[in-house]
Amino acid sequence: MAPKAAKGAKPEPAPAPPPPGAKPEEDKKDGKEPSDKPQKAVQDHKEPSDKPQKAVQPKHEVGTRRGCRRYRWELKDSNKEFWLLGHAEIKIRSLGCLIAAMILLSSLTVHPILRLIITMEISFFSFFILLYSFAIHRYIPFILWPISDLFNDLIACAFLVGAVVFAVRSRRSMNLHYLLAVILIGAAGVFAFIDVCLQRNHFRGKKAKKHMLVPPPGKEKGPQQGKGPEPAKPPEPGKPPGPAKGKK
């Protein structure tokens, strides 16, 4: 048993508590003394940056692109579709055949209807080539351009075949330039028919969108400017009951 403390002796002072920022002795490693500075709490989330982040745009859709960014995407997508599906090559070949036929017939005396048909078809083929090359049709959505192109090819094929038949029947003897011009007109008609077949393959497996030609609903008309809402009318006061009629 420990000896009892003598009477009148002062008790031993308790050890001083460690400072609040100091680490306990158990956490000391490699003889390093604990720092007096408290550690900062680790932030779980990063601070938001002041720079606005750009939204990721889809590759196969126009998304929210505007201005020049939208036109660049439309131009690239339109030319990709126009050249990969074979429409550009067919239309350019048809246009080349018609221009060559016009040059060959320029030095001969032919019926004016042949010149008219060739000039008309050159104009239509040039129009559609420029339309698809510069993506103009993407900004005119109220016209069904694939259907218009399909009808243009059908009409061009019919007109060019008719021009060949008319050119053969209108002359009994044909020189070399005239014969070459007739062959080129027929080749342009064949290319137009091939373009019709390509248009049909393009339409396969596609469904028309519902309500595509339905106009958007009109906006509800708000209150007229300068006129506030009409104040509510106060309720009419009740009429006092009439005097009771006495009996005679």
From Swiss-Prot:
Residues 23-63 have a biased composition (Basic and acidic residues). The chain crosses the membrane at residues 116-136, 147-167, 178-198. InterPro entries: Marvel, MARVEL-CKLF_proteins. Residues 12-22, 231-248 have a biased composition (Pro residues). It is found in: Membrane. One of its GO terms (molecular function) is cytokine activity. This is CKLF-like MARVEL transmembrane domain-containing protein 2. The gene is CMTM2.
